[in-house]
Structure formats: C-alpha cells, structure tokens
Amino acid sequence: MSPWSMPKASSRTLATGAAKAIGEVLPGLKGKLDGIAVRAPVMDGSLVDLVCRVKRTVTKDEVNAAMKAAADGPMKGILEYCTDPIVSCDIIGNPASSVFDSLSTSVMQGDMVKVLSWYDNEWGFSNRVVDALMKLA
C-alpha cells in the first residue's frame, strides 16, 4: 500500500505498517516476504487481498496490463482499474464490483502474485442485482 494513501482515511485509517516491521524485528526475513495488515471493522468499503501462484513467470507490469485490459474490455463497468493511491473510503458509492489497486500489485519469485482490490460491499452488489434484473426484463 502506498504511504500516500495512508492519510486520506484520516480517523478511519485501516492499513498498518506491520508487514514492514517484520523485517526490522526479524532481519533474516527482510526482503523475503511482503504483506499488508488491515484493521477491521470497516464501514461499506471492503478489501480483497488475493495471493496466487501462476503457471508462468510474470512481472508486475504484465499483471497490471492484464487487469487493465479486462477493465477496459469484457469487465468494463464491473472491474475498475485504479492508478491512484486508494483507501476504503475512496470507494464508497462506487458502482464497480471491484476497484483494482494497481499500485499495490506485487510479484514474488516470478510466479507468486499478490493483488488488492477494493469494493463497496453494499452499492457494488446492488448494481450487479440491477444488471441482472435488466437482463431478465
């Protein structure tokens, strides 16, 4: 998570520096792991923290390009691609089901990918219900 996104949440800040502190407390782990800690509960803003192993070696830029292509193409209106620092309060009222946080993408050892995506767990879902009803009408 970008340090520039931290102040935007003001009294509702959710991100912590716990992952960075691990390398300071256990120097043998410095540079060997990465992560994020998120405080809960949150209001409507929610975060998906997804880590997966992929079949081939990839870069951060390749992962972000694939997500951008999906957001601009077949997932337009459902997936939003974000290039700005973002926190939970930024997505309140956003109709997208997923706001991909491109600044937080990381790739470890070439095949372990970590992505973050935010969503308004009330409004985003409501918009998908309306989409489904419109298809049925």
Q: What are the roles of these predicted feature ranges?
A:
Residues 39, 118-125:
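Glycine-rich phosphate/pyrophosphate-binding beta-alpha loops
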Residues 1-112:
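C-terminal substrate-binding/catalytic lobe of Rossmann-fold NAD(P)-dependent oxidoreductases
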Residues 54, 133-137:
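Short, hydrophobic alpha-helical segments
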Residues 68, 131-132:
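Short intrinsically disordered coil segments
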Residues 128:
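C-terminal catalytic subdomain
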